[in-house]
Curated annotation (Swiss-Prot):
Function statement: Catalyzes the conversion of 3-deoxy-D-arabino-heptulosonate 7-phosphate (DAHP) to dehydroquinate (DHQ).
Coiled-coil region: none
Binding site for NAD(+): 73-78, 107-111, 131-132, 144, 153
Organism: Koribacter versatilis (strain Ellin345)
Name of the protein in question: 3-dehydroquinate synthase
InterPro entries cross-referenced by the UniProt entry: Dehydroquinate_synthase, DHQ_synth_AroB, DHQ_synth_fam, DHQS/DOIS_N, DHQS_C
Cofactor: Co(2+); Zn(2+); NAD(+)
GO terms classed as biological process: amino acid biosynthetic process; aromatic amino acid family biosynthetic process; chorismate biosynthetic process
Transmembrane segments: none
Length: 366
C-alpha cells in the first residue's frame, strides 16, 4: 500500500493506494472517524452490483450501519436535481450531522456526493472511494465538488476536502476498456505539467500500461496523485498554481458541453483539449515543434479518440463561459516543455476557432 498525504489549509488527509484496499475500508475510515455510526454509500447501479458486497462487509465489520443510495452515472446526472434527490433520500433514512457519506464510483459520483456532503446540514464528512482510473488520479483528490448547468460544466460547486481517499486499482477489473483508457489522459496531463519522468514512462511503457500491468498501474496512480497533492497543497482554491491542473480542460469542457455531455468521455475531451492547446502553443511559439509532436502523438496513441463534428465557432464561444474566464479573459494553460506549462491570457478567439478546426481535421485523418 502507498500513502500520499494531502495537506491543505482546510484539512490534511491521506490518499491510500493499493490492491484490495476496499476490503479494509472500514478499518481505514474508523481511524479518521472513530465516532461515526451511519454511512451513506452513494453509488451507481453498475458499481453497486460489483462492489457493494465488499464495501458492506468492510464497513459493518467496524460497526457502521450501511445505507446505499443510487444515482445515475454520467455527466447528464451531474445536476442540482440529483443533489436534491440524494439529500431528500438521506433525510428519509434518518441522516444527521453524525452521518458520513462514502462516494463509491467514478468522477461524477464523487463530484455529486462530495457536493451533497458539503451542503447537507452545512457539511458532513465524505470519504472518496473512486472506482475509475480518472477518479483515482484526479477528481477524488483536492476537494473540488460540483454539478453542471446548461451554460457549462462545474459552474455550481464547493471546495470541500474529503476525510480520506481509498484508491483500489483492483476495481479496474470491471472497468470497460474505453473508460480505462480515457482515464489515462489525466496521468498524461500530470506528466506534461510537472513530471517529465512520468511522461517518459508513459511513452516507453505504453503497451504495459494499456494491458493494465498491476505494478505499473499502481505506480502511475501513486505518482499522478503526488502531482495533484503537491499542486493542491500549494493552492487549495485555484487562485494561482492550481490552474495548471486545467491543462486541456478549457477546450475539453467546451467540447463536452457542445455535445450535451453525451458523446465524449471526460478524459477523451481532455485529450482533444490538450492537443488543441498544444497546437495553440506551437503557433504562438511558446513551445517547439518537437515537444508539440511528442504531446500530440502520445495523446493519439493511448486511445482511438472520438471524431469531432462540432461547430468550431459555437464551441469556441462556450470557452468564454468557462469558470477559468476572469473579467472576460480566458486563462489557457499552454505547454512550454515536458514538465513545464504557463498560464496565458493572450490566446485570441480566432486561435481557438482555428485549433478546433484543426482538431476536426485531425480526428478524421488521424
Amino acid at each position: 500500500m502507498n500513502r500520499v498525504p494531502v495537506t491543505t489549509s482546510s484539512r490534511t488527509y491521506d490518499v491510500l493506494i493499493g490492491h484490495e484496499i476496499l476490503r479494509d475500508a472500514g478499518k481505514h475510515i474508523r481511524v479518521v472517524l472513530p465516532k461515526a455510526k451511519r454511512a451513506f454509500v452513494i453509488t451507481s447501479a453498475p458499481v453497486r452490483k460489483h462492489w457493494a458486497g465488499i464495501v458492506t462487509d468492510a464497513l459493518t465489520a467496524e460497526g457502521f450501519e450501511v445505507i446505499f443510495l443510487e444515482m445515475e452515472d454520467g455527466e447528464r446526472a451531474k445536476n442540482m436535481a440529483s443533489v436534491e434527490d440524494l439529500a431528500l433520500k438521506m433525510m428519509a433514512k434518518g441522516a444527521d450531522r453524525q452521518s458520513i457519506i462514502c462516494a463509491l464510483g467514478g468522477g461524477v459520483v464523487g463530484d455529486v456526493a462530495g457536493f451533497v456532503a458539503s451542503v447537507f446540514m452545512r457539511g458532513i464528512p465524505v470519504i472518496q472511494m473512486p472506482t475509475t482510473f480518472l477518479a483515482q488520479v484526479d477528481s477524488s483528490i483536492g476537494g473540488k465538488t460540483g454539478v453542471n448547468l446548461k451554460a457549462g460544466k462545474n459552474l455550481v460547486g464547493t471546495f470541500y476536502q474529503p476525510w480520506l481517499v481509498l484508491a483500489d486499482p483492483g476495481v479496474f477489473s470491471t472497468l470497460p476498456e474505453r473508460e480505462f483508457r480515457s482515464g489515462l489522459y489525466e496521468s498524461l496531463k500530470c506528466g506534461v505539467i510537472r513530471r517529465p519522468d512520468l511522461f517518459d514512462r508513459m511513452e516507453r511503457d505504453r503497451q504495459r500500461i494499456v494491458e493494465r500491468d498491476p505494478g505499473l498501474i499502481e505506480w502511475l496512480i501513486t505518482e499522478s496523485v503526488r502531482v495533484k497533492a503537491d499542486v493542491v497543497g500549494a493552492d487549495e482554491h485555484e487562485s494561482g498554481e492550481r490552474r495548471i491542473l486545467n491543462f486541456g480542460h478549457t477546450i475539453g469542457h467546451a467540447l463536452e458541453a457542445e455535445t450535451a455531455y453525451k458523446y465524449f468521455l471526460h478524459g477523451e475531451a481532455v485529450a482533444w483539449g490538450m492537443i488543441a492547446v498544444t497546437m495553440i502553443a506551437a503557433g504562438l511559439q511558446r513551445t517547439d515543434s518537437a515537444t508539440a509532436q511528442r504531446i500530440i502523438s502520445l495523446c493519439l496513441a493511448y486511445a482511438p479518440l472520438p471524431k469531432i463534428e462540432v461547430n468550431a465557432k459555437k464551441t469556441a464561444n462556450r470557452v468564454k463561459g468557462d469558470k477559468k474566464t476572469v473579467h472576460g479573459v480566458t486563462h489557457f494553460i499552454l505547454p512550454r516543455e515536458i514538465g513545464k506549462v504557463e498560464v496565458a491570457i493572450d490566446v485570441t478567439d480566432r486561435a481557438v476557432v482555428q485549433a478546433i478546426e484543426e482538431l476536426k481535421y485531425l480526428s478524421f485523418v488521424g
